[in-house]
């Protein structure tokens, strides 16, 4: 069990626990350039399954996949000024090739609204060309000052959807539709419950009219933004000239959306489900769903025969891994656990004498004897149980650690305790900044529907004369965040 000894208990030091899990769980290595990582098979396998699943979801909404260039001419990028200001501190630029300086700087893609705006301008002329609904799977570069594997790296992977519509209503509807799809995907596949809502003006995407978000609670109580969907309105179409003739033969500008999730989801899986033995990967998204371990096969040749038979049967429909190495049983078990494989089947001489094998759940570490004739059926049952248990545990943790604040003093105490704090708030940017400076908390989202706990709440900042009662109409979730 030496591998497990390399992991710092999460209760002792959550940040170090996270680092230990990602470096020991076949998830990543640090790249040679500072702030970059190498995605190893265990993490990239999850990402491949995310791609496969979301592509199926997207197709139901008429989404077509394309690929756009990595480089953006600086003059094109600068047209939408709010967008430029939002990304300017993180921009990487190409200024020289070989010994020759470029006549114009090239921006290395931090996001692709600009490229898609240029594409839409060329391809859209009439309402008959609409809607355009595109997605791309790509890498992006943002020069983060402080980096953390999967959560903030200078290069990361994501999908970004971009659409153009003939009306604001259609675009707004699509924006909401996609955030709901992300919420369902996180629940059904990643076993992660979320809080969803609209971003405040200060927190919305640079260049958006409005931003919708899904926010997950990590085991340390901090929030992680796990997906966003932006209604761009005509904020890009007007400056970039994306116009079309509508049904009345009048010139109009398209209404746009953009939406995406990234490899931050890998960090979310680790910090929502992981324990002191490593990552726990939900079965529906796991690259390896079942590990089959041969135990003391050198003492009984029947072990290998049975293990191979189980492997051949299960691998017809599931991703299964067979460990027939001569490593010790303890090493094999700890390797499976630290990599987060949802279920392992131990095939050993003693169990075979009783015509059974041992199932070990990764989520609870519970061991169960299963008759050989029932292995196939029970594997499917166990994977469903594990998936559901992971979600229910995360949901319970979210509910138990989401609280209401009745005044600013209570609010500060709850933030210190790393809670999600729901407060009535006027969404004044100045006050958001003050709260962040004092407590480290930021508004994660404005809730659409809230059931107050029977007490009339005043705006959390009313005590210092910041706002009037009638402005305190929004309920906002605050939390410290990654």
From Swiss-Prot:
EC number per UniProt: 6.1.1.15
This protein's GO CC annotations: aminoacyl-tRNA synthetase multienzyme complex; cytoplasm
Location relative to the cell: Cytoplasm
Uppermost EC category: ligase
SUPFAM superfamilies: C-terminal domain of ProRS, Class II aaRS ABD-related, Class II aaRS and biotin synthetases
Major subcellular location class: cytoplasm
Keyword Nucleotide-binding: yes
Disulfide bonds: none
Catalytic reaction list: tRNA(Pro) + L-proline + ATP = L-prolyl-tRNA(Pro) + AMP + diphosphate
GO biological processes: prolyl-tRNA aminoacylation
Keywords per UniProt: Aminoacyl-tRNA synthetase, ATP-binding, Cytoplasm, Ligase, Nucleotide-binding, Protein biosynthesis
Molecular function via GO: ATP binding; proline-tRNA ligase activity
Keyword Nucleotidyltransferase attached: no
HAMAP family, per database record: Pro_tRNA_synth_type3
Family: Belongs to the class-II aminoacyl-tRNA synthetase family. ProS type 3 subfamily.
The protein's assembly and partners: Homodimer.
Domain free text: Consists of three domains: the N-terminal catalytic domain, the anticodon-binding domain and the C-terminal extension.
Function recorded in the entry: Catalyzes the attachment of proline to tRNA(Pro) in a two-step reaction: proline is first activated by ATP to form Pro-AMP and then transferred to the acceptor end of tRNA(Pro).
Listed name of the protein: Proline--tRNA ligase
Taxonomic source organism: Mycoplasmopsis synoviae (strain 53) (Mycoplasma synoviae)
Annotated gene: proS
């Amino acid at each position: 069990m030496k591998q497990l000894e390399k992991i710092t208990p999460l209760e002792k030091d959550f940040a170090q626990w996270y680092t230990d899990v990602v470096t020991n769980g076949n998830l990543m290595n640090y790249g040679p350039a500072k702030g970059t990582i190498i995605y190893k098979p265990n993490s990239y396998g999850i990402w491949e399954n995310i791609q496969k699943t979301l592509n199926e979801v997207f197709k139901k909404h008429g989404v077509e996949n394309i690929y756009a260039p990595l480089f953006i001419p600086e003059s094109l990028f600068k047209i939408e000024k709010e967008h430029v200001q939002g990304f300017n501190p993180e921009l990487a630029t190409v200024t020289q090739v070989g010994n020759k300086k470029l006549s114009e700087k090239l921006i290395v893609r931090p996001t692709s609204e600009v490229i898609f705006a240029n594409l839409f301008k060329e391809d859209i002329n009439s309402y008959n060309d609409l809607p355009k609904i595109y997605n791309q799977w790509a890498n992006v570069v943002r020069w983060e000052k402080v980096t953390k594997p999967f959560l903030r790296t200078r290069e990361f992977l994501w999908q970004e959807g971009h659409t153009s519509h003939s009306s604001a209503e259609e675009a707004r509807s699509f924006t909401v539709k996609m955030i709901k799809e992300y919420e369902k995907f996180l629940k059904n596949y990643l076993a992660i419950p979320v809080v969803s809502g609209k971003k405040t003006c200060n927190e919305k995407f640079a260049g958006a009219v409005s931003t919708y978000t899904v926010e997950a609670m990590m085991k340390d109580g901090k929030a992680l933004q796990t997906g966003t969907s932006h209604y761009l309105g005509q904020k890009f179409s007007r400056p970039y000239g994306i116009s079309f003739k509508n049904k009345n033969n009048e010139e109009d500008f398209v209404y746009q959306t953009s939406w995406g999730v990234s490899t931050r989801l890998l960090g979310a899986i680790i910090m929502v489900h992981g324990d002191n033995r490593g990552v726990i990967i939900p079965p529906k998204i796991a690259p390896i769903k079942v590990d089959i371990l041969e135990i003391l096969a050198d003492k009984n040749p029947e072990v290998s025969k049975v293990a191979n038979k189980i492997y051949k049967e299960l691998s017809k429909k599931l991703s299964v891994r067979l460990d027939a190495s001569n490593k010790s049983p303890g090493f094999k078990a700890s390797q499976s656990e630290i990599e987060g494989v949802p279920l392992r089947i131990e095939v050993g001489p003693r169990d075979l004498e009783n015509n059974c094998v041992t199932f070990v759940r990764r989520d609870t570490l519970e061991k169960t004897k299963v008759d050989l004739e029932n292995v196939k059926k029970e594997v499917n049952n166990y994977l469903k149980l594990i998936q559901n248990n992971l979600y229910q545990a995360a949901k319970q943790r979210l509910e138990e650690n989401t609280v209401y604040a009745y005044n600013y003093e209570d609010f500060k105490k709850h933030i210190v305790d790393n809670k999600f704090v729901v407060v009535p708030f006027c969404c004044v940017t100045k006050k958001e900044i003050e709260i962040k400076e004092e407590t480290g908390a930021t508004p994660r989202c404005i809730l659409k529907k809230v059931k107050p706990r029977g007490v009339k709440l005043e705006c959390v900042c009313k005590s210092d004369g910041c706002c009037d009662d009638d402005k305190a109409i929004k309920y906002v979730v605050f939390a410290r965040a990654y």
